Amino acid sequence: MRDAIFLSTWFWETHNVTERICMALAQLGCKVLYCEPPMSIVRGRPRPMRDLQKGVYAFQSASVGGRLNQVPLLRDWQAAALKKEIHRAACHIGLKDPLVFYTWWQRGILPLCAQMKRDHFMVHLWLDHRPWADPNCDRFVELSDTTMTIPRSDFHELKAKYGSKVVLLPQAVDFTRLTASTAGPEPDVLTSIPRPRIGYLGYPGTSLNLPLLSSLLKARPDWHFVSVGAEKAVPLPNAHTLPWARPEDLGHYIQGLDVGFLPYDCADEWNLHRVPMKMLECFAFGIPVVSTPLIHFWECKDLIYLGDTADELAAAVQAALDEPADSPKRATRIEIARHHSLESLAAKLRQRLPLDDSSQN
């Protein structure tokens, strides 16, 4: 089994899509070197290498800074230095013929990707819709040996341009960990919030249609909206917040909801094409979900209650609250979430990438 180097945009604690792909690779028996964004030597020292979980190791390299990328000669020198640091760390943990994974969000690492291309099979992860024209996005695809995309609409657009090197990658939910430890009493932070609870278990930033949410909650003061973070989504008495939870504790929050609520602002093209893990995390417990009509989930319209306006979403929430506890829709949602588990993702990665020892770059 070949191993993997992951050039991450984030840090492991975010537990987002890229981190779950690392976990899926580790399930296959790959060793994964998870490279956090480089630390500028002007700002401090890189974090030391550490074990994250079985088979996954975190590493942070040192860089002079992003401004060097504005000078071609210095840019190439810094990319070569970063590559050398990464290879040294890969040798330290004994990686075998590793594939390199990267995303198009990392525009500043394009020179590093070009350097890594000389020695590695390159896997480009296209995780979100591209709502603006950026030539670097195409350059990242061109550098790759395989581009794996999650939004189905982007998959068809890219495949029409680049052919069979573009493959579809399913969104994944950590189904086993999410559902494994949900026994016991409801968390105290939830008990104080009246029912019915409609919840968006993330930070309610600009991706949500906040004016629409405010209109809905004003019209239905008996419904209580729950989000995560320090600040309420809207300044209303029936809007509530929960503290951030560890991934293994998130299931307790989801079980405490009556309805999952995803009122994304679909006037923004990026949101319209979203493939949120929050949808699948709610599905893992079978609870009904109300959402604005995200393109990727149109095929699940019989399992999701949809609406565009405040009035339509209010009707959708009421229909979701009225869904019988023994509705067959609940079992179907759970089965869909299980189909998007890390184990299923691992099987897809094994099928679509040259991970066997005998594979050649």
Question: Residue spans of the language-model regions?
Answer:
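A charged, aromatic-enriched C-terminal amphipathic alpha-helix characteristic of glycosyltransferases
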Residues: 324-355
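A short alpha->beta transition loop at the rim of the catalytic pocket in nucleotide-sugar-dependent
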Residues: 29, 258, 286
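Conserved acidic donor-binding segment of nucleotide-sugar-dependent glycosyltransferases
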Residues: 244, 303-311, 318-325
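Carbohydrate-associated surface elements
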Residues: 153, 171-175
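Nucleotide-sugar-dependent
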Residues: 13-16, 248, 252-253, 262-283, ...
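N-terminal subdomain of nucleotide-sugar transferases
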Residues: 1-45, 217-218
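Conserved catalytic-core segment of nucleotide-activated headgroup transferases in glycan assembly
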Residues: 175-256, 279, 307-309
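Membrane-proximal helix-turn-helix segments that form the acceptor-binding/catalytic region
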Residues: 87-91, 115, 128-147, 154-155
